[in-house]
Amino acid sequence: SASDRADALAFVARAARMNEAAVIRLQGRPDGRLGLWTHTGFDVLATRSIVGGSAPADIVCDAEQLRTVLAVADAGTRVDPGFTFASAWKGALPPASGYVHVDDVPARSVVELARSGAKLARTEGSAHGPATGLLDQVVLEASALDGRQPVAIILRSVFALTAMGFIRDADGREVTDTSELTRIADD
């Protein structure tokens, strides 16, 4: 669909913007969707799924090449992602199942954490970027209603969420560095 194509294009464009040598891993899922995966600059995997498939069912391609063909292709048409870059993919993907919903975190909280973290990274970082210790700092803990299964969320994950455009305001628009906090829902 056109919205799936737009989602894929936005995801791939953000990956390419974060890293000019970014690769995208396309992998068919058991539910009939296509998973798009990329390594962010924060050592965090990011993924998006769309309706679709690929042949072969698991392929690694250049993000910029894929962005270029997605930008000009009509919805519903097959795209050729170009040459495969299997050797450019580092590591394995996480399991396809076994996850549970633990809690919802308000978008405003994530944005405030990202902005505070960015400010601290600018003052405490170096020419090489933020210190690893800062990125690995737990900035939020989420847990189920019964208090079990606490999940520690580190700053690098918060940065990856915002850099990949996964945080939206109350109207569904992407939150940026200049977005007003009042436009982001409290809950």
Residue ranges and their predicted role:
Residues S1-V51:
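N-terminal ordered "arm"
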Residues P30, G35, A46, P56, ...:
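Proline-rich intrinsically disordered, low-complexity coils
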Residues L45-P81:
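A broadly used, surface-exposed interaction patch
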Residues G76-D187:
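Long, compositionally biased intrinsically disordered terminal regions
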